């Protein structure tokens, strides 16, 4: 069970006590290098640093809320927001950076009036999810119907989430902000320095920009990513580590799957997310349209760089194989791929296809089996093989220039609120935390931060409080810190548990996955508290889930080897957090 001992000491202090009276001696700040008299200084109630999805959503939330809309707000972004506002892909082309927005997140965006500016022809409802073990093939399936057995505050949604390109969301938010009078957007403007007004504790921060303008703010909000200047100014430390894992992303193309075709029960529309946990990292295929999907393949840095350097057709062959072939076959394919790369003779599509075909023969995969992918021409014609709905559609092409990669990391700020000479600052989104993408919750975490912060500031205004004071911001910290910590720890644990092929661990995690897949109450709780249901989730969800668990004698003992507290994991990890100690959930009712 997650407890306060998992958090940094300063976070525990913030969550349990009043604000500290003196600044921490370890925090240091640069001295002012320029004369303020040479620059104009303008006062704002709120200054937001960062114009990504989180920063724009925060600006929209503040600018459209009935209470906070009276605040004078500025948003500073280093890049050009004009490019985002005018973004337009060619027909059939898609950005390689996409997000899965939970129904809760969509509801928040809708509440700001921004969703009507999102191009809904470029969004895809996520109607189901298939997650399975790359060694044992133990599987769990999620769909909105799993919510039907649980108490909710509203109707069961038709979809679990909405897939959309990040740029589509950003453009919609920008268009909404065009009609919000009290929010000023300052793009192509870099933050040169952040200083205290007169260098005093609790004084207003002053942001000096590359354009020569200075902005003094009652509250400075960092929505400025992992390398947050606001966090550095506030002297807030962040703990974490880099994973020995990189993510490869790309836009994939598939044959059309007509759900109204003859033998429709064998055909499926492209509205299911697929994720397979390989020992080198999870691979996910996320639907965009009936014929396009987004790839997120987390693997070792060496394999990632080799896949990116390979011909796109070779990468497509490896993607199909990674979802279908046994672990031993994949390890052999990796060796062949790396060997060819080291010899500076990248593996050709023809050679890659031949190797996959040999692997299929070696592991008794028949030519028209759902697990086959070598003879792609015959597999994409006629009636699909039985079991095709359990696997993503075959990749027949990759969008030009869509292949990219980036390192993965875990981080969590020790607090979200600045104190002392770093006072009147608060962090949201990636400035406060970064998470492994296997849970698909990074942006949703940030939007949850923003929703709580807007509510917190609205309450401060309603009670006549100073919106930049520690006490006014503390409810936001208390609402979000432990929630985010739960998700971060559970996701990190999943990454580690599925990164081994040790037989006892494989057996334990596979047994747990199969047990939970048979319990709709548990699956519904996983989805409900992850935001699949826009209604509030209360203790009744846990009671329903625990009731289902108690009928399963010995399940807690079976899963204890995996460790962790399922209730904490479920609470914030969402549909991918399917491992943990079921016994902890049983005990939570006692």
Where are these regions (language model features)?
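N-terminal mitochondrial targeting presequence
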Residues: 1-42, 589-590
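Beta1/beta-strand and adjacent pyrophosphate-binding region of the FAD-binding site
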Residues: 38-54, 74
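Glycine-rich FAD pyrophosphate-binding loop
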Residues: 47-49, 63-97
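N-terminal FAD cofactor-binding segment of flavoenzymes
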Residues: 61, 85-136
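Central beta-strand plus flanking loop segment that forms part of the substrate or channel wall
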Residues: 114, 227-274, 279-282, 289-294, ...
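Conserved N-terminal helical subregion
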Residues: 121-234, 239-251
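FAD/FMN-dependent oxidoreductases across multiple families
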Residues: 310-468
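C-terminal helical "tail/cap" subdomain of flavin- and related membrane-associated enzymes
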Residues: 393, 455-590
